[in-house]
Amino acid sequence: MAWRDRRGALRAILEGSACVRPASVYDAISIRIADDLRFPLGMFGGSVASLAILGDPDSALITLTELAEQMRRMARAAALPVLVDADHGYGNALNVRRTVQELEAAGCAGLTIEDTLLPQAYGEAKPQLISSEEGLGKINAALDARLDPSLVIIGRTGACSISSLDDAIERAVAYEAAGVDALFFTGVKARDQLQAISAATRLPIVLGSPPAELADWEYLAAQRVRIAVQGHAPIAAATEAVFRTLSALRDGAAPQQLTGLATPELMDRVTRASLVDERGARFLGLARE
């Protein structure tokens, strides 16, 4: 699927009437599994990128180059549209332009730019926001940097949990007026908050990790929520599986005694082994087994 087709698929989700729950993806294998399972969308989060690439918690240490290269690997591996959490754009508004250029070239379907002050400021234990003016400048820079008009750019605010609901709405309305394609809110905890956001804005809404009170997909869809991100369980599950397997091997288990491993058939499927064999036969004169 060409980049524009993937971006069109994401736009179709935003223009639709359902609330989609994307697959958390972070490498070539995870995106292929999500694609094979027919998820409509992948989400490449900043926290999961930090885990997968650096083995670090979500502490804003990853670089744009590392993020874009990982996105490029995933885009080559499967045709699933991917929405990338581009954090703060890796600097000021001029850095945001570069971020959009690199992620667009890497094949993402869309990206989010947020207003959290990153990296963490000296002496500040709690998250902080950049000013509304700086946040709007970043959004305008992102929109200006977009070469493919089908690339989805989403303005994200954490104001609900950091400052106030009113501040979140004010920032979102400004991003909407600037021309973003959707609005991403984190920290929304209650229905009355979401309803206030929905009433004050017009664009499709993306929610980050909605709590149990909001985990009603029909209700969310009625409030114009088109994407609800549900955290990053796959990488946690993979980490547990590797830990258990290596622990068993360390304790003397023989490989044939291990349980919970992918079958050879599943490994062939996610590595696209039959396609590699086919290409070997076509281009290298190799007999297919």
Curated annotation (Swiss-Prot):
It comes from the Bacteria. It is an enzyme of class 4 (lyase). One of its GO terms (biological process) is pyruvate biosynthetic process. Its EC number is 4.1.1.112. Belongs to the isocitrate lyase/PEP mutase superfamily. Oxaloacetate decarboxylase family. It comes from Rhodopseudomonas palustris (strain HaA2). One of its GO terms (molecular function) is magnesium ion binding. It holds the Pfam family PEP_mutase. Keywords: Decarboxylase, Lyase, Magnesium, Metal-binding. Mg(2+) binds at D85. This is Oxaloacetate decarboxylase. Binds 1 Mg(2+) ion per subunit.
